[in-house]
């Protein structure tokens, strides 16, 4: 479909400049050939960007023997959210997202704008959360990996992964 659209545009405006942008394409030279430009092609690589700071959060509370689901660390997660402008709190399942969100909401004595995002929520509700996040209206979003699927997050100061991620790419 993209190829057909580009061909039609080339027929309508043969001298038009084509610009292809991607943050994730694995082979930029192949993408440049796909654009099928008549003139010269420049591939500009912005580089990997700054190295992320990665740390393991040590909770002040003791880890319970069973049934904890990281809830013993929610006060520490809330304190981390308070110290940043925008935080994403990733969990692995929708059920975890609901539980973590509810615990953080109970701790939220500062009335920080905290939202919930997962695949079982109404599409309209998810879009509202995404738009509020892009505008910078939210201090934190508790979410599953549905939030990282092609969304421009804007400025995110802190990302917290609660529990082990499902895969290495996360």
What residue ranges belong to the model's regions?
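Helicase motor core with emphasis on the C-terminal RecA-like subdomain
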Residues: 1-170
